[in-house]
């Protein structure tokens, strides 16, 4: 993902530690939602899933997974973005 914000920009625009919102979009098949949530949990080395919500498109072809974990630093944010980009089935991450 070459369009990631810099750690400096994240530090200027967010308060750490604190919540950060990630969104991944993909097809709702083969455990996509579970893979996205697990990727965030594992990257942040948490024991439980972070808060998340899902929304399917009207036709049901795609699903948006919004995950809102507590992060400690801008570097955590960048690490999660990198991890999400590697999840099978992810089409977009923001």
Positions of PLM-derived features:
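Long, contiguous binding/interaction regions
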Residues: 1-94
């Amino acid at each position: 993902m070459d369009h990631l914000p810099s750690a400096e920009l994240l530090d200027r625009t967010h308060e750490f530690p604190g919540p950060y919102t990630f969104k991944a979009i993909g097809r709702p098949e083969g455990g996509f939602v579970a893979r996205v949530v697990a990727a965030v949990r594992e990257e942040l080395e948490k024991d439980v899933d972070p808060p998340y919500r899902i929304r399917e498109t009207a036709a049901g072809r795609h699903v948006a997974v919004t995950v809102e974990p507590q992060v400690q630093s801008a570097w955590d944010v960048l690490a999660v973005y990198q991890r999400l980009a590697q999840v099978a089935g992810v089409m977009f991450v923001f």
